[in-house]
Amino acid sequence: MAEDDIKIVMFCCNWCSYGGADTAGTARMQYPTNIRVIRVMCSGRIEPQFVLKAFREGADGVLVTGCHHGDCHYDAGNYKLDRRMRLIYKLADELGIGRERIHHDWISASEGEKFAETVKMMVNRIKDLGPSPIKKQLAEA
């Protein structure tokens, strides 16, 4: 799969990981442009159906990022995300998407380099996996 064809949706917490994207940008760190960032107020607000809809709309992979444990602006949002991610990974496997197309990580506002490296890692992973199997199913329908 050509790197330019890869589409990744990235859910970013408003208070930390979105700030990490800003830090990466202001520091002029290089990372692939294959991501589409969706800012959410808290990673704990990310529902499984958001991730599934991203695949249904043509994403090849999904990144979910939030504050480190103990740093959540809303106290326990990242712990809620931990529980939801277990469900999301299970659903991805059961639906034939594959959990390897989804990654979640904790990125603070000061971790621009980690933001850029996480994006690069995900693009390389999706490049190796190829297009989402959901794309093929939708094309045949």
From Swiss-Prot:
Cofactor: how and how many bound: Binds 1 [2Fe-2S] cluster.
Role description: Part of a complex that provides reducing equivalents for heterodisulfide reductase. MvhD may form the contact site to heterodisulfide reductase.
Subunit structure: The F420-non-reducing hydrogenase is composed of three subunits; MvhA, MvhD and MvhG. It forms a complex with the heterodisulfide reductase (hdr).
Alphabetical keyword list: 2Fe-2S, Electron transport, Iron, Iron-sulfur, Metal-binding, Oxidoreductase, Transport
Highest taxon listed in the record's lineage: Archaea
Segment forming the signal sequence: none
Family to which this protein belongs: Belongs to the MvhD/VhuD family.
Pfam families: FlpD
Protein name listed in UniProt: F420-non-reducing hydrogenase iron-sulfur subunit D
Cofactor: [2Fe-2S] cluster
UniProt GO molecular function: 2 iron, 2 sulfur cluster binding; metal ion binding; oxidoreductase activity
Enzyme class per UniProt: oxidoreductase
EC numbers for this chain: 1.12.99.-
Presence of keyword Oxidoreductase: yes
